[in-house]
Design a protein with these regions (language model features):
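Flexible, non-catalytic linker and terminal segments flanking ANL/adenylate-forming cores
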Residues: 1-22
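A short, compositionally biased
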Residues: 2, 33-38
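A short, structure-level motif marking secondary-structure boundaries and short turns
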Residues: 13-16, 25, 45-47, 73-75, ...
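Short, flexible loop segments at the rims of nucleotide/cofactor-binding pockets, characterized by
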Residues: 17-21, 53, 100-103
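Conserved AMP-binding/adenylate-forming core of the ANL superfamily
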Residues: 19, 30, 38-83, 87-91, ...
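Residue-level signature of the cytosolic catalytic core of signaling kinases
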Residues: 21-25, 126
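Structural core segment of the AMP-binding/adenylate-forming
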Residues: 67-68, 95-163
Length: 163
């Protein structure tokens, strides 16, 4: 199905179609990091994260996931707020050739049990404030490991924000 009704108001200098690259989402990050290593990839509470740092963090986390037994095609729950940790975790899961299962941080026990059972996830990357909801699942589901992220890791120590 092709949608064209917007073409009448589309800017004339922009193409109406585009060819998608034959690359993975992770490869696109890798290319950006090689081309623009010192450009800002993420800003979090006034602290910029450069593409070089983002790629290094992603590679380290992907290596950790693989060392923990995450293999190609495994499903990994991603249960945290929008943050640099989310971005790093998302790309790291992809880099490990696993499948990202994003879980809304508003979900609690019943929904979490469903996600774990439905996807067969054995590993979860969770934000610190959500650990209390996901850690009990280690005893009642097939979940084997929870990695908890601390949100203050990437905060600029000199920020004047009220944290």
């Amino acid at each position: 199905m092709t949608f064209t009704r917007h073409h009448s108001v589309w800017p004339k200098e922009l193409p109406k179609t585009m060819t998608l690259p034959d690359t993975s989402v992770f490869t696109n990050l890798e290319i950006s990091a090689l081309r623009y290593p010192d450009h800002t990839a993420v800003i979090y509470y006034d602290a910029p994260m450069r593409y070089r740092q983002l790629l290094a963090e992603v590679e380290a986390m992907a290596g950790y996931l693989q060392a923990q037994g995450v293999e190609k095609g495994d499903r990994v729950l991603l249960y945290m707020q929008n943050s640099p940790q989310y971005v790093v975790s998302y790309y790291a899961i992809l880099r490990a050739d696993a499948v990202v299962i994003p879980v809304n941080p508003m979900n609690r026990a019943a929904e979490l049990e469903h996600y774990i059972a439905d996807t067969g996830s054995r590993v979860c990357l969770a934000g610190q404030e959500l650990a209390g909801f996901i850690l009990p699942m280690l005893d009642s589901t097939d979940l084997e490991q929870v990695v908890v992220a601390s949100y203050n890791t990437y905060i600029n120590k000199d920020t004047d924000l009220d944290l």
